[in-house]
Amino acid sequence: MESYLVDTYQGIPYTAAVQVDLVEKDLLPASLTIWFPLFQANTPPAVLLDQLKTLTITTLYAASQSGPILKVNASAQGAAMSVLPKKFEVNATVALDEYSKLEFDKLTVCEVKTVYLTTMKPYGMVSKFVSSAKPVGKKTHDLIALCDFMDLEKNTPVTIPAFIKSVSIKESESATVEAAISSEADQALTQAKIAPYAGLIMIMTMNNPKGIFKKLGAGTQVIVELGAYVQAESISKICKTWSHQGTRYVLKSR
């Protein structure tokens, strides 16, 4: 079993984001990825990660109003595991690599292949951008963050677009507002990091946010969900080799 620690916050308590790569113990084993609901931990990350290696997990492929899901049951040994969520559901669209190998409504025991632990700031200091492109009231534009990374292994640039929020702006003022937002963002954003959770996430740490970012609060870590952005086997490599170079902001008319 492999294990990886992505450390974005050094302190206790911290918010733990745990993701696990699994293979079903089945005649036609499917590969899948599940992630636990965020939880707050007081155990040193190295100890928590070590106890996560004792995980036993079963999954059940099911349906819901929002689409296919995986129902997850988990157990593990160790005192730190008392705070670990034991029953939860995850989006099957992100979790599953191979739909054709899954049996509907069948409880399946899984073998844990890889455990990822990402540490973030404590509750109250972690926020999330909701990645929704649905119309919101009379909003006219979407604020998009273009996060630039460098793949240090291949020495190639990678840009990830992330939806931030919807805003109301007159078309004649959009260029001026976009410039102002860019200036505010330069002061607000200090760093971004890729981490394995819900497929893949980007963690942006805010510092002295102003204007459109001021509600986020100084020092807040913001999660941007990227979903099934890459194949599961590439996640650990990306977390190690992608370096944040900078973030640009653009306004896109709805």
UniProtKB/Swiss-Prot annotation:
Transmembrane segments: none annotated. Belongs to the pneumovirinae M protein family. A motif (Nuclear export signal) lies at residues 194-206. One of its GO terms (molecular function) is structural constituent of virion. One of its GO terms (cellular component) is host cell nucleus. It is found in: Virion; Host cytoplasm; Host nucleus; Host cell membrane. Signal peptide: none annotated. GO terms for biological process: virion assembly. Plays a crucial role in virus assembly into filaments and budding. Early in infection, localizes in the nucleus where it may inhibit host cell transcription. Later in infection, traffics to the cytoplasm through the action of host CRM1 to associate with inclusion bodies, the site of viral transcription and replication. During virus assembly and budding, acts as a bridge between the nucleocapsid and the lipid bilayer. Gene3D superfamilies: HRSV-S2 matrix protein, N-terminal domain. Residues 110-183 are annotated as: Nuclear targeting and binding to host importin KPNB1. This is Matrix protein. Forms dimers. Forms higher-order oligomers. Interacts with glycoprotein G (via N-terminus). Interacts with protein M2-1; this interaction directs the matrix protein localization to cytoplasmic inclusions comprising viral proteins L, N, P, and M2-1 and mediates the matrix protein association with the nucleocapsid. Residues 1-110 are annotated as: Interaction with M2-1. Its main location: virion. It is a peripheral membrane protein. Keywords: Host cell membrane, Host cytoplasm, Host membrane, Host nucleus, Host-virus interaction, Membrane, Phosphoprotein, Viral matrix protein, Virion. The modification Phosphothreonine is found at T205. It comes from Human metapneumovirus (strain CAN97-83) (HMPV). Phosphorylation is important for oligomerization.
